[in-house]
Amino acid sequence: MGSKSSKSSGFENVPSLGLSHTNQPRVSLIREARPSLYGRYNCKCCWFQNKNLVECSDHYLCLKCISSMLRRGQNCEICGKPIPTHIAVTTAPTAPPEP
């Protein structure tokens, strides 16, 4: 309500994502990577994270790397396709169901 600006969120330089358009399909967030025949799934950008991964065409990216790439542009630096910006977060129960 005043002329003072609020705290910086750190996303001032992120390009507009057009979140009002809902025609882009939602990509699911993978909370914990599944083991595979060839080892575990990792973020293809940093090769470290194996939790909170998002599938981008044929590989996975962690949320930190996606945020970093979105600051520089809207296309993935690995495959060149648009970075998924609509993520469906599934809710997991925090406690076992009551008997």
Curated annotation (Swiss-Prot):
Could you tell me where this protein is found in the cell? Virion; Host cytoplasm, Host perinuclear region; Host cell membrane
GO terms under biological process = viral budding from plasma membrane; viral budding via host ESCRT complex
**A single GO molecular function term of this UniProt record:** zinc ion binding
Q: Where is the lipid attached (N-myristoyl glycine)?
A: 2
Zinc finger feature spans (RING-type) = 43-79
Show the InterPro entries listed in the entry.
RING_finger_Z_arenaviridae, Z_RING-type_Znf_sf, Z_RING_Znf
Query: Polar residues bias located where?
Result: 1-11
Cellular component per GO, a single term: host cell plasma membrane
Topology class, membrane:
Lipid-anchor
Which residues belong to the signal peptide in this entry?
none
For the region Disordered, give the residue spans: 1-21
Q: Briefly state the modifications made to the protein after translation.
A: Myristoylation is required for the role of RING finger protein Z in assembly and budding.
Q: Main subcellular localization, coarse class?
A: virion
Renumbered ranges of motif PTAP/PSAP motif? 93-96
Task: Give the keywords, sorted.
Answer: Host cell membrane, Host cytoplasm, Host membrane, Host-virus interaction, Lipoprotein, Membrane, Metal-binding, Myristate, Viral budding, Viral budding via the host ESCRT complexes, Viral release from host cell, Virion, Zinc, Zinc-finger
For this protein, the record's SUPFAM superfamilies field holds: RING/U-box
Family statement:
Belongs to the arenaviridae Z protein family.
Main role? Plays a crucial role in virion assembly and budding. Expressed late in the virus life cycle, it acts as an inhibitor of viral transcription and RNA synthesis by interacting with the viral polymerase L. Presumably recruits the NP encapsidated genome to cellular membranes at budding sites via direct interaction with NP. Plays critical roles in the final steps of viral release by interacting with host TSG101, a member of the vacuolar protein-sorting pathway and using other cellular host proteins involved in vesicle formation pathway.
Quaternary form?
Interacts with protein NP; this interaction probably directs the encapsidated genome to budding sites. Interacts (via RING domain) with polymerase L; this interaction inhibits viral transcription and replication, Z partially blocks the product exit tunnel for the releasing nascent RNA product. Interacts with the glycoprotein complex; this interaction plays a role in virion budding. Interacts with host eIF4E; this interaction results in eIF4E reduced affinity for its substrate, the 5'-m7 G cap structure.
Q: Which HAMAP family match?
A: ARENA_Z
**Record comment regarding domains:** Late-budding domains (L domains) are short sequence motifs essential for viral particle budding. They recruit proteins of the host ESCRT machinery (Endosomal Sorting Complex Required for Transport) or ESCRT-associated proteins.
Q: What is this protein called?
A: RING finger protein Z
Which organism does this record belong to?
A: Oliveros mammarenavirus (isolate Mouse/Argentina/RIID 3229/1990) (OLVV)
Q: Which gene encodes it?
A: Z
